[in-house]
Amino acid sequence: MSEFTCVEAKSRFRAIRWTVEHLGLPKGFEGHFVGYSLYVDEVMDMSGCREEYILDSTGKHVAYFAWCVSCDIHHKGDILDVTSVVINPEADSKGLQRFLAKRFKYLAELHDCDWVSRCKHEGETMRVYFKEV
């Protein structure tokens, strides 16, 4: 049995809280967690992304990610676009990272995608990485 399982996200609260714990509130929302949370909900509701939580073997929420199938003018073929990945800072591990990579590959293959794209924070910047399936 796997150490982790996936469930459909019904609420984004945990993911928003983890993001703020890790990165702080963005400009314009300083001191306004509720306002930021409402903003995130509005943007994600309009995005059309599918959202999942990863649970550990005890049922604890350890990660969240949002994804959709899209395309890119440079990369030929459909792309599994992982738009957000948020990991509970207390639960990050190599095992969780491996599980996420396998989950992304599984979803890409399930939806006949040729690529997986993922955004990652690097200091004050954000980079998009593409990996062929």
UniProtKB/Swiss-Prot annotation:
This is Protein 7. It comes from Escherichia phage T7 (Bacteriophage T7).
